Swiss-Prot record:
GO terms for cellular component: extracellular region; immunoglobulin complex; plasma membrane. It comes from Homo sapiens. Residues 20-44 are annotated as: Framework-1. Residues 74-109 are annotated as: Framework-3. Keywords: Adaptive immunity, Cell membrane, Disulfide bond, Immunity, Immunoglobulin, Immunoglobulin domain, Membrane, Secreted, Signal. It is found in: Secreted; Cell membrane. Residues 54-70 are annotated as: Framework-2. Residues 71-73 are annotated as: Complementarity-determining-2. Immunoglobulins are composed of two identical heavy chains and two identical light chains; disulfide-linked. This is Immunoglobulin lambda variable 7-43. Residues 45-53 are annotated as: Complementarity-determining-1. The gene is IGLV7-43.
Length: 117
């Protein structure tokens, strides 16, 4: 069986109360099915902490965004076990372990700057 690369697109979706804030994600990543990949989300204001309540969303073509992770590492009941959220090196991180073909999508992070301390 041939392995088909998956393309994971990451877009910034993090408007906050401070118009000068910039949130950065990898523009795109490629991973083979069964592999593991970590997507990150950084803030120009400094290290991302749990006080930013990092959220992660997945959007597939023609569909509305679907929430995956909230408050850094909490999963919704519909979030597959292979998705996990964490803080890594001052960034919010989303890790996919055992990537499946259906994981090909755009992934967004959302940070709440009003709650950051």
């Amino acid at each position: 069986m041939a392995w088909t690369p998956l393309f994971l697109f990451l877009l910034t979706c993090c408007p906050g109360s401070n118009s000068q804030t910039v949130v950065t994600q990898e523009p795109s990543l490629t991973v083979s099915p069964g592999g593991t990949v970590t997507l990150t989300c950084a803030s120009s204001t400094g290290a991302v902490t749990s006080g930013y309540y990092p959220n992660w969303f997945q959007q597939k073509p023609g569909q509305a965004p679907r929430a995956l992770i909230y408050s850094t590492s909490n999963k919704h009941s519909w979030t597959p076990a292979r998705f996990s959220g964490s803080l890594l090196g001052g960034k919010a991180a989303l890790t996919l372990s055992g990537v499946q073909p259906e994981d090909e999508a755009e992934y967004y992070c959302l940070l709440y700057y009003g709650g950051a301390q």
